[in-house]
Amino acid sequence: MRKKVRKAVIPAAGLGTRFLPATKAQPKEMLPIVDKPAIQYIVEEAAESGIEDILIITGRNKRSIEDHFDRSAELEFNLREKGKTETLKEMQQIADLANIHYIRQKEPLGLGHAVLCAEHFIGDEPFAVLLGDDIMVSETPALRQLMDVYDVYGTEVVGVQSVLPEDVSKYGIINTSGSQGHVYEVNDLVEKPSPEEAPSEIAVMGRYVLNSSIFSVLKTIGRGAGNEIQLTDALREVCRKEPIHARLLEGNRYDIGDKLGCFKASTEIGLMRPEMRSQLLAYLEDVIKRETKEMLR
């Protein structure tokens, strides 16, 4: 009987240099998107997908991530004393999202190495990997979409979306022989190809379901691009021996790995909040009018 996906890994050891100076003294994963730190959206997606245990791969100066997902007796006492029961309940729910564990990636040797750090936590079970630079908003959680495919095929599954031809060099791109509905069979993966070399315009979007056999592959592939251990290289090795599937993700994806993407995510997620929507729309309309008037001068 095929094992269910119960565990997830969230790599969060990066330095966040694109967001300096904001990340000089705090992790980029803790930067707010409206009123939640970015990593909370990722943890919530995992929990809503049915994940029970989450391992966050951290590094130096990441202690605030652990504090965020822990209980805070002082804060809870303060909220209780002030009668802020709804806020108190919300804070307590953060600590109860899942069983969250932590381990440090002692060297910045790439995504594949970060995944390899989770080997003892995962054991011989299938598991999910969620990258913190991609926030997905969808009716069915993005990870759940992948897990449903895994339940059918039992193979590695990657989450994908179509991108513009000029953007293929930013992503891992799949080579596929065809699809059944939203599911592709993957023949190969190419990491950040030029538009001329790209086998398709279907890009990997930071969500994976992997079998534990990936660990032995990661140990043998050696270092790839950037002198780092690349997860894409390991998946290419798997492709040569057995099928891999890709799930075309339904929903909106927000790339918060750069400043503009982070701003877009905050704006659009803010528009989804009923208490903010009308005022935010009015503000954006006013900005557009002012900027348009300025441009026409």
UniProtKB/Swiss-Prot annotation:
According to its UniProt entry, one GO biological process term is: UDP-alpha-D-glucose metabolic process
What does the sequence similarity comment in the record state about its family? Belongs to the UDPGP type 2 family.
Instruction: Quote the InterPro entries the UniProt record gives.
Output: GalU_uridylyltTrfase_bac/arc (IPR005771), NTP_transferase_dom (IPR005835), Nucleotide-diphossugar_trans (IPR029044)
The UniProt catalytic activity note for this protein reads: alpha-D-glucose 1-phosphate + UTP + H(+) = UDP-alpha-D-glucose + diphosphate
Which ranges of the sequence are coiled-coil?
A: none
| SUPFAM superfamilies on file | Nucleotide-diphospho-sugar transferases
GO terms of molecular function: UTP:glucose-1-phosphate uridylyltransferase activity
Q: What induces it?
A: Expressed under anaerobic conditions.
Q: How does this protein assemble? A: Homodimer.
State which gene encodes it.
Answer: yngB
Species of origin reads Bacillus subtilis (strain 168)
What are its E.C. numbers?
A: 2.7.7.9
> Which terms are listed as keywords in the entry?
Carbohydrate metabolism, Nucleotidyltransferase, Signal, Transferase
Q: What is this protein called?
A: UTP--glucose-1-phosphate uridylyltransferase YngB
